[in-house]
């Protein structure tokens, strides 16, 4: 796969994602999006959440097909719609990640307001989530069998899901928040020190780095979660070494305290 000029990547995004009354994404956003999509295709993350504007499934399908036509992507990426949110997914890598999640490689932090402080949960303590993950794996396995029909699309009904938890898993985080859906408007993270992890990679010369991951864990639980975080970093560095599209992987963390945390 070749890397088209930045001008072509920007044009592909603006011509497909900025149609009609939607505002065209700015140049920097277009290039960052292309980098994120390429990172998904190269197995550096299972999925990316599209949040540049209100473009829907058809526009995203056109965008990915345009990138394929430029020789930027191989066929195989998938669009997953959950509620009003759209993800660009690598079914192959997402399956691998979800299967590992069922084996306990991802930790969950319960931040329900009813608790005095956050606490760690395992996937085995969340049976409804286990069932949901298994269902998504089954759907993705079916998709991997045929990539010849253009960019495929799946819509999942999510009325009773904890979207915060599901999104964290799909985005490849080693730790995902969960909470009581009956009190979804609040949590116990207010004024709680959080360790925020970020992973960045370099791509186009002269352009800002690509933000690959950004997630947080309560600082008080960092010792209990360290093995999950170390395993995630090791796996990411292994996958990074196996590709040649990006350079300069940088993983860092800082502790912040916020008056309120929206999930």
Curated annotation (Swiss-Prot):
Family under the similarity heading: Belongs to the UPF0739 family.
PANTHER family: UPF0739 PROTEIN C1ORF74 (PTHR31366:SF2)
Protein name, per record: UPF0739 protein C1orf74 homolog
Organism: Mus musculus (Mouse)
InterPro entries in UniProt: DUF4504 (IPR027850)
